UniProtKB/Swiss-Prot annotation:
Primary residence: nucleus
Annotated signal sequence range: none
Any one GO CC term of the record: nucleosome
Keyword Repeat assigned: no
Full protein name: Protamine
Region (Disordered): 1-34
One Gene Ontology molecular-function label: DNA binding
Organism: Dicentrarchus labrax
One annotated GO biological process: cell differentiation
Reported tissue expression: Testis.
Subcellular location: Nucleus; Chromosome
Function summary: Protamines substitute for histones in the chromatin of sperm during the haploid phase of spermatogenesis. They compact sperm DNA into a highly condensed, stable and inactive complex.
């Protein structure tokens, strides 16, 4: 179970990074549209 917990931790970090990029792109579009 120790290896599975470690693998789940990095996976969450990678997903957060992808969400950060999508949130930044959406914020730019809202600024450009406004």
């Amino acid at each position: 179970p120790r290896r599975r917990r470690q693998a789940s931790r990095p996976v969450r970090r990678r997903r957060r990074t992808r969400r950060s990029t999508a949130e930044r792109r959406r914020r730019r579009v809202v600024r450009r549209r406004r």
